[in-house]
Amino acid sequence: MEMQSYYAKLLGELNEQRKRDFFCDCSIIVEGRIFKAHRNILFANSGYFRALLIHYIQDSGRHSTASLDIVTSDAFSIILDFLYSGKLDLCGENVIEVMSAASYLQMNDVVNFCKTYIRSSLDICRKMEKEAAVAAAVAAAAAAAAAAAAAAAHQVDSESPSSGREGTSCGTKSLVSSPAEGEKSVECLRESPCGDCGDCHPLELVVRDSLGGGSADSNLSTPPKRIEPKVEFDADEVEVDVGEQLQQYAAPLNLAHVEEALPSGQAVDLAYSNYHVKQFLEALLRNSAAPSKDDADHHFSRSLEGRPEGAGVAMSSMMDVQADWYGEDSGDVLVVPIKLHKCPFCPYTAKQKGILKRHIRSHTGERPYPCETCGKRFTRQEHLRSHALSVHRSNRPIICKGCRRTFTSHLSQGLRRFGLCDSCTCVTDTPDDDDDLMPINLSLVEASSESQEKSDTDNDWPIYVESGEENDPAGDDSDDKPQIQPNLSDRETLT
């Protein structure tokens, strides 16, 4: 069996110990104020303190002190009271500070509770404002109806008996129309925060006036339809008000019906300065009978032909709305938005996937292009090409250091940097006895060739032939071999 009162009693005892500073082994400094607490309570409820106290597990005897710079002292005091009592003291003034402090201390339960509190508070305020607006609208409608009734009665009393019937009919019409106007004002207050009906529905008023100026047959056959702007509903109020909205509002009138209902030569006076009208135009373009952009432009040009010259601002606003819907216009061609490829490591974006792949190599360190001669790797192929042309000089002939011959193509990897051809790296001495083969010491060859290089004007090694003429192989052999043989004989006598 569980005792529900045990938890509250245990928390109460711990809170009493904290207030009396009994067995408190932790201190938190916030904005100069010192708060005493127990490590176990902080460790069990806060992820921030859990990560902070994990370093002091072995040093259980030491007194821990933490300093918080981001959290306010009032918010931390409320959170600390919640840890020891389970009660969170929230109000409209401190809920934001408490929620930010709980988020910093990694207390998800407190954050979710604050969000719920904010949502419920906003719902209550919204309902109160809505009820007040409806009550004010009903009172205004009742006052208008009473004033209209008084005016009608006064008109009936002042007129002659012969025209009394006409006055009575007119008064009846005014009485019938005044409640409709009251309902209209109530709907305007519900739909938008502004109370001016003229700013909320400019299209509706103009269409009604134009339809009222037509023939009586058209008024009887085609009743005026209402144009309602796009209204953004709150997610919590949609389920409650959707039935009422569907019953009260008629179907929205598209642009083609407006043009058919208007008489020829009369233009629609559009007020584009209102934000709700812009939303309505976006919805109108989305649901219009014109299937393409050209048809929509044709409809708008027809409806705006009779506008005065002083309506330049309204025209510019219309083009802004149209550009937002269709995208950028370049003459008669519609420019399709370009898809940008985003780097997963930084904010860099590229128009082509290959460019982004090359950019990602700067983050990963990948170098997929190695040099065949020296083994150095590069991120781009053109860098490898320039490296091969500038460093290894593959197109220039090189004079061998041993035999003084020029060589370009008959090379193995890495021999170009030593300046020796293949024949000089494999030179051997062939005495009378073919069975005993002694390899040539290349260090002696280099020592003998150094004396010849000192007399040369060019001291760079390896030596490159700039003129492109190759030396005579026969002449080089006749000059160099007699010098190599004495050195070898001296070496043999020394050993």
Curated annotation (Swiss-Prot):
Biased composition (Acidic residues): 467-479
Stored PROSITE patterns: BTB, ZINC_FINGER_C2H2_1, ZINC_FINGER_C2H2_2
Protein's name in the database: Zinc finger and BTB domain-containing protein 8B
Zinc finger (C2H2-type) boundaries: 341-363, 369-392
Region (Disordered), start-end ranges: 157-178, 446-495
Start and end residues of each BTB domain: 24-92
InterPro entries the UniProt entry points to: BTB/POZ_dom (IPR000210), SKP1/BTB/POZ_sf (IPR011333), Znf_C2H2_sf (IPR036236), Znf_C2H2_type (IPR013087), ZnFinger_BTB_dom_contain (IPR050457)
SUPFAM superfamilies, A to Z: beta-beta-alpha zinc fingers, POZ domain
